[in-house]
Amino acid sequence: DDIDVFMMRDDYNKMLKIAPNYFKEPYFFQSAYTDVMVWGFSKLRDSRTTAIEFDDMKEQFNQGIFIDIFPLDSTDDGSAKMKTVTNIKKDIWDCIFNREAILNNIDNPDIWKIFTLDKDMILELVNMSYKDALRVFEEFCETHLYDTDKLRCWSSEVMGRLRKHYERKWFDKIEYAQFENILVPVPADYEEVLTMEYIEWKIPVKSETLHSGIIIDPDISYKEWLKSHTKYKKNVME
Protein backbone atom coordinates (compact mmCIF):
# COMPACT_ATOMS: atom_id res chain seq x y z
CA ASP A 1 0.00 0.00 0.00
CA ASP A 2 3.07 2.24 0.00
CA ILE A 3 6.73 2.09 -0.97
CA ASP A 4 9.41 1.37 1.63
CA VAL A 5 13.04 2.10 0.75
CA PHE A 6 15.91 0.67 2.79
CA MET A 7 19.41 2.16 2.98
CA MET A 8 22.56 1.23 4.86
CA ARG A 9 22.91 3.43 7.94
CA ASP A 10 25.98 5.31 6.69
CA ASP A 11 24.24 6.23 3.41
CA TYR A 12 21.09 7.11 5.33
CA ASN A 13 22.94 9.49 7.65
CA LYS A 14 24.51 11.21 4.63
CA MET A 15 21.06 11.57 3.11
CA LEU A 16 19.77 13.30 6.28
CA LYS A 17 22.32 16.06 5.70
CA ILE A 18 21.86 16.42 1.94
CA ALA A 19 18.17 15.76 1.27
CA PRO A 20 16.51 18.82 2.90
CA ASN A 21 18.25 21.14 0.43
CA TYR A 22 18.26 18.71 -2.49
CA PHE A 23 14.51 18.14 -2.78
CA LYS A 24 12.51 21.16 -3.92
CA GLU A 25 8.78 21.89 -4.15
CA PRO A 26 6.50 20.09 -4.68
CA TYR A 27 8.59 17.43 -2.92
CA PHE A 28 9.41 17.56 0.77
CA PHE A 29 11.94 15.50 2.69
CA GLN A 30 10.55 14.90 6.19
CA SER A 31 12.52 13.68 9.18
CA ALA A 32 12.83 14.28 12.91
CA TYR A 33 14.97 17.31 12.04
CA THR A 34 12.39 19.01 9.81
CA ASP A 35 9.18 18.50 11.80
CA VAL A 36 7.70 18.11 15.26
CA MET A 37 7.41 14.31 15.03
CA VAL A 38 10.36 12.26 16.29
CA TRP A 39 10.90 9.21 14.09
CA GLY A 40 13.74 6.81 13.50
CA PHE A 41 13.11 6.95 9.74
CA SER A 42 12.29 9.54 7.05
CA LYS A 43 9.63 10.27 4.45
CA LEU A 44 9.78 11.80 0.99
CA ARG A 45 6.42 13.47 0.32
CA ASP A 46 4.60 15.02 -2.63
CA SER A 47 2.99 18.21 -1.31
CA ARG A 48 0.42 18.25 -4.12
CA THR A 49 -1.26 15.13 -2.73
CA THR A 50 -3.00 13.91 0.43
CA ALA A 51 -2.09 11.08 2.82
CA ILE A 52 -3.67 12.10 6.12
CA GLU A 53 -2.42 10.09 9.08
CA PHE A 54 -3.08 12.77 11.71
CA ASP A 55 -6.17 14.87 11.06
CA ASP A 56 -5.51 16.96 14.17
CA MET A 57 -2.16 18.25 12.90
CA LYS A 58 -1.87 21.73 11.44
CA GLU A 59 -1.08 22.44 7.79
CA GLN A 60 2.57 23.13 8.61
CA PHE A 61 3.03 19.38 9.10
CA ASN A 62 3.37 17.95 5.60
CA GLN A 63 0.96 15.08 4.93
CA GLY A 64 1.41 14.47 1.23
CA ILE A 65 1.63 10.94 -0.19
CA PHE A 66 4.96 9.50 0.89
CA ILE A 67 7.77 7.03 0.44
CA ASP A 68 9.13 5.69 3.75
CA ILE A 69 12.93 5.50 4.01
CA PHE A 70 14.40 3.19 6.65
CA PRO A 71 18.04 2.70 7.67
CA LEU A 72 19.50 -0.79 7.99
CA ASP A 73 21.75 -1.36 11.00
CA SER A 74 23.90 -4.11 12.45
CA THR A 75 22.04 -6.26 14.96
CA ASP A 76 22.53 -8.96 17.58
CA ASP A 77 24.23 -11.96 15.96
CA GLY A 78 24.59 -13.94 19.18
CA SER A 79 28.06 -12.65 20.04
CA ALA A 80 28.74 -10.92 23.36
CA LYS A 81 29.90 -7.78 21.57
CA MET A 82 26.76 -7.39 19.46
CA LYS A 83 24.50 -8.12 22.43
CA THR A 84 26.15 -5.19 24.20
CA VAL A 85 25.93 -2.94 21.12
CA THR A 86 22.23 -3.77 20.68
CA ASN A 87 21.52 -3.17 24.38
CA ILE A 88 23.21 0.24 24.20
CA LYS A 89 21.06 1.12 21.17
CA LYS A 90 17.99 0.19 23.21
CA ASP A 91 19.21 2.37 26.09
CA ILE A 92 19.67 5.41 23.86
CA TRP A 93 16.31 4.77 22.20
CA ASP A 94 14.58 4.61 25.59
CA CYS A 95 16.19 7.93 26.48
CA ILE A 96 14.49 9.43 23.43
CA PHE A 97 11.06 7.82 23.48
CA ASN A 98 10.59 6.80 27.13
CA ARG A 99 12.35 9.67 28.84
CA GLU A 100 9.35 10.71 30.92
CA ALA A 101 9.12 7.25 32.49
CA ILE A 102 12.85 7.38 33.27
CA LEU A 103 12.65 10.86 34.81
CA ASN A 104 9.56 9.91 36.83
CA ASN A 105 11.45 6.95 38.33
CA ILE A 106 14.78 8.65 38.80
CA ASP A 107 14.86 7.80 42.53
CA ASN A 108 13.91 4.17 41.99
CA PRO A 109 17.14 2.13 42.25
CA ASP A 110 15.63 -0.75 40.29
CA ILE A 111 15.31 1.26 37.08
CA TRP A 112 19.08 1.59 36.73
CA LYS A 113 19.46 -2.20 36.68
CA ILE A 114 17.80 -2.44 33.25
CA PHE A 115 20.38 -0.27 31.48
CA THR A 116 23.75 -1.20 30.03
CA LEU A 117 24.87 2.45 30.06
CA ASP A 118 25.72 3.97 33.42
CA LYS A 119 23.38 6.32 35.29
CA ASP A 120 25.32 9.48 34.42
CA MET A 121 25.12 8.75 30.69
CA ILE A 122 21.39 7.96 30.89
CA LEU A 123 20.72 11.23 32.71
CA GLU A 124 22.78 13.14 30.17
CA LEU A 125 20.76 11.61 27.31
CA VAL A 126 17.31 12.20 28.82
CA ASN A 127 18.19 15.84 29.41
CA MET A 128 19.23 16.40 25.80
CA SER A 129 16.72 17.65 23.24
CA TYR A 130 14.98 14.87 21.31
CA LYS A 131 16.92 15.78 18.18
CA ASP A 132 20.31 15.82 19.89
CA ALA A 133 19.63 12.44 21.52
CA LEU A 134 18.52 11.05 18.15
CA ARG A 135 21.80 12.23 16.62
CA VAL A 136 23.67 10.30 19.32
CA PHE A 137 21.65 7.21 18.41
CA GLU A 138 22.28 7.60 14.68
CA GLU A 139 26.00 8.18 15.12
CA PHE A 140 26.31 5.16 17.43
CA CYS A 141 24.49 2.99 14.88
CA GLU A 142 26.79 4.16 12.10
CA THR A 143 29.90 3.54 14.20
CA HIS A 144 28.89 -0.11 14.66
CA LEU A 145 27.35 -0.74 11.22
CA TYR A 146 30.15 -3.03 10.07
CA ASP A 147 30.67 -4.95 13.33
CA THR A 148 28.67 -7.90 11.96
CA ASP A 149 27.14 -9.11 8.70
CA LYS A 150 23.68 -9.52 10.26
CA LEU A 151 21.41 -6.53 9.57
CA ARG A 152 18.00 -5.42 10.72
CA CYS A 153 15.80 -2.36 10.44
CA TRP A 154 15.66 -0.73 13.88
CA SER A 155 11.89 -0.27 13.67
CA SER A 156 11.58 -4.07 13.39
CA GLU A 157 13.84 -4.38 16.44
CA VAL A 158 11.67 -2.00 18.45
CA MET A 159 8.44 -3.75 17.42
CA GLY A 160 9.86 -7.17 18.34
CA ARG A 161 9.90 -8.48 14.78
CA LEU A 162 13.10 -10.37 15.44
CA ARG A 163 12.47 -13.11 12.88
CA LYS A 164 13.31 -10.63 10.15
CA HIS A 165 16.98 -9.98 9.54
CA TYR A 166 19.18 -9.66 6.48
CA GLU A 167 22.62 -10.86 5.48
CA ARG A 168 24.99 -8.15 4.30
CA LYS A 169 26.04 -10.23 1.29
CA TRP A 170 22.48 -10.00 -0.07
CA PHE A 171 23.16 -6.31 -0.73
CA ASP A 172 26.68 -6.64 -2.15
CA LYS A 173 25.45 -6.30 -5.72
CA ILE A 174 22.48 -4.46 -7.15
CA GLU A 175 20.50 -4.72 -10.36
CA TYR A 176 17.78 -2.54 -11.82
CA ALA A 177 14.17 -3.70 -11.97
CA GLN A 178 11.22 -2.15 -13.76
CA PHE A 179 8.67 -0.48 -11.49
CA GLU A 180 5.87 1.06 -13.53
CA ASN A 181 7.68 3.59 -15.76
CA ILE A 182 11.00 3.77 -13.90
CA LEU A 183 13.96 1.54 -13.15
CA VAL A 184 14.80 1.12 -9.47
CA PRO A 185 17.89 -0.43 -7.85
CA VAL A 186 17.22 -3.69 -6.00
CA PRO A 187 19.54 -6.22 -4.33
CA ALA A 188 20.75 -8.87 -6.76
CA ASP A 189 19.73 -11.41 -4.08
CA TYR A 190 16.25 -9.92 -3.82
CA GLU A 191 14.62 -13.36 -3.56
CA GLU A 192 16.42 -13.99 -0.26
CA VAL A 193 15.33 -10.56 1.01
CA LEU A 194 11.70 -11.13 -0.01
CA THR A 195 11.63 -14.62 1.52
CA MET A 196 12.93 -13.25 4.81
CA GLU A 197 10.41 -10.39 4.71
CA TYR A 198 7.27 -12.23 3.57
CA ILE A 199 8.10 -15.98 3.59
CA GLU A 200 5.64 -17.08 0.83
CA TRP A 201 5.97 -13.88 -1.17
CA LYS A 202 5.06 -15.46 -4.52
CA ILE A 203 1.53 -16.24 -3.31
CA PRO A 204 -0.85 -13.23 -3.52
CA VAL A 205 -2.56 -12.49 -0.20
CA LYS A 206 -5.73 -10.47 0.25
CA SER A 207 -5.60 -8.75 3.62
CA GLU A 208 -5.91 -5.39 5.33
CA THR A 209 -3.08 -2.99 4.56
CA LEU A 210 -0.79 -1.56 7.20
CA HIS A 211 -1.92 1.95 6.30
CA SER A 212 -5.62 1.18 5.91
CA GLY A 213 -6.63 4.10 8.14
CA ILE A 214 -4.89 6.76 6.07
CA ILE A 215 -6.98 9.11 3.92
CA ILE A 216 -5.45 9.07 0.43
CA ASP A 217 -6.20 11.52 -2.37
CA PRO A 218 -3.67 11.98 -5.20
CA ASP A 219 -5.60 14.86 -6.75
CA ILE A 220 -5.64 17.50 -3.99
CA SER A 221 -3.09 18.91 -1.59
CA TYR A 222 -3.22 17.82 2.05
CA LYS A 223 -3.57 21.53 2.90
CA GLU A 224 -6.81 21.74 0.94
CA TRP A 225 -8.09 18.56 2.58
CA LEU A 226 -7.26 19.81 6.09
CA LYS A 227 -8.96 23.15 5.44
CA SER A 228 -12.17 21.54 4.20
CA HIS A 229 -12.09 18.88 6.93
CA THR A 230 -11.59 21.49 9.66
CA LYS A 231 -14.58 23.44 8.34
CA TYR A 232 -16.63 20.24 8.26
CA LYS A 233 -15.78 19.35 11.86
CA LYS A 234 -16.58 22.90 12.98
CA ASN A 235 -19.98 22.82 11.26
CA VAL A 236 -20.83 19.44 12.79
CA MET A 237 -19.90 20.65 16.28
CA GLU A 238 -22.00 23.80 15.83
For each of these PLM feature ranges, what is it?
Residues 19-77, 97-197, 204-238:
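Conserved catalytic core of two-metal-ion nucleotidyltransferases
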Residues 1-16, 181:
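Catalytic metal-binding acidic patch
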Residues 88:
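Short, His- and charge-rich active-site/binding loops that engage polyanionic ligands
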Residues 78-84:
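A short secondary-structure junction signal
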